[in-house]
Amino acid sequence: MNSATSLMCFALLLISPLCMGYTAEDREADSRRVAEIIKNSQDDNSKINSIQELLDIYKRLYPSLTPEERESIDNFVNEHTDEVLVDGVPSQGGRKTKFAGKILSEATKGVATGFFEELGSKLAGLFTG
């Protein structure tokens, strides 16, 4: 009885990581969501407000990317984000855009919308191959 329980626990440990992966359905849903965000973000404010959602999609997509794809997008994102620190340690939310939640000048809006458009096109490119 004890060995059967141990074997069952071991089997669950081996199988559980397979169930938590980024599935093809998740990838397809994120692909549709990126396309929808890009299509529906017509003005500067909607683009700026959608940046965090694009970053969240990238965070979900991250484990399934090649090291080269990760490095390319990470370098781009790191140039335009601040790491949020709480007591010198990254918060659970991680990085936030420099633009979100601020009153923006026209020059900053231009940079933020450019970031949105570039990040959106990079993510869309990952989904289309």
Curated annotation (Swiss-Prot):
Its main location: secreted. It holds the Pfam family Turandot. Residues 1-21 form the signal peptide. InterPro entries: Turandot. GO terms for cellular component: extracellular space. It is found in: Secreted. The keyword Hydrolase does not apply. The keyword Metal-binding does not apply. One of its GO terms (biological process) is response to UV. Keywords: Immunity, Innate immunity, Secreted, Signal. A humoral factor that may play a role in stress tolerance. Belongs to the Turandot family. This is Protein Turandot B2. It comes from Drosophila erecta. The lineage of its organism: Eukaryota, Metazoa, Ecdysozoa, Arthropoda, Hexapoda.
